[in-house]
């Protein structure tokens, strides 16, 4: 039982293992940068990034948590007096909507950590 407490601590503190999901949140913006803040999602929610376009102007973006049934939808949204067509793209990993390319790394790291913890638990009972 030597590894018991450290493994329990990692399970409690690692969001990918416990099922806790944070997403990046930022309001609608016309800036290419959307640094945002972290927000906690509900069990039935996914992280999303919304990309909006309107004829003759630059794109808009927003991020946050959304009910999984809203993923992939395109809907009109008003921003700064213009109507944009906003498409919601969802992902299900911890902070997966943070930026391009980071979601895959974060998800891979989480899965790798889960595999490592599982192997350590198995070794604990064999030794």
Curated annotation (Swiss-Prot):
A lipid is attached at residue 97 (GPI-anchor amidated asparagine). Residues 98-127 form a propeptide. It is a lipid-anchor; GPI-anchor. Disruption phenotype: Male mice are subfertile, and show defects in sperm-zona pellucida binding and penetration. Disulfide bonds join 23-47, 26-34, 41-65, 71-90, 91-96. GO terms for cellular component: inner acrosomal membrane; outer acrosomal membrane; plasma membrane; side of membrane. It is found in: Cell membrane; Cytoplasmic vesicle, Secretory vesicle, Acrosome; Cytoplasmic vesicle, Secretory vesicle, Acrosome inner membrane; Cytoplasmic vesicle, Secretory vesicle, Acrosome outer membrane. Residues 1-19 form the signal peptide. It comes from the Eukaryota. Residues 23-97 form the UPAR/Ly6 domain. One of its GO terms (biological process) is cell adhesion. Testis specific. Expressed in spermatozoa (at protein level). Keywords: Cell adhesion, Cell membrane, Cytoplasmic vesicle, Disulfide bond, Fertilization, Glycoprotein, GPI-anchor, Lipoprotein, Membrane, Signal. Pfam families: UPAR_LY6. InterPro entries: LY6_UPA_recep-like, Snake_toxin-like_sf, SPACA4/Bouncer. Gene3D superfamilies: CD59. Its main location: membrane. Sperm surface membrane protein that is essential for effective sperm-zona pellucida binding and penetration during fertilization. Belongs to the SPACA4/bouncer family. This is Sperm acrosome membrane-associated protein 4.
């Amino acid at each position: 039982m030597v590894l018991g407490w450290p493994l329990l601590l990692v399970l409690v503190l690692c969001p990918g293992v416990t099922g806790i999901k944070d997403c990046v949140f930022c309001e609608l913006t016309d800036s290419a940068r959307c640094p945002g803040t972290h927000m906690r999602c509900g069990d039935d929610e996914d992280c999303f990034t919304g990309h909006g376009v309107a004829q003759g102007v630059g794109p808009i973006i927003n991020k946050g948590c959304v009910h999984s049934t809203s993923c992939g939808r395109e809907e009109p949204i008003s921003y700064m007096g213009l109507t944009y067509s906003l498409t919601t793209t969802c992902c299900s990993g911890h902070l997966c909507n943070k930026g391009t390319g980071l979601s895959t790394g974060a998800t891979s790291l989480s899965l790798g950590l889960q595999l490592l913890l599982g192997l350590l638990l198995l070794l604990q009972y064999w030794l």
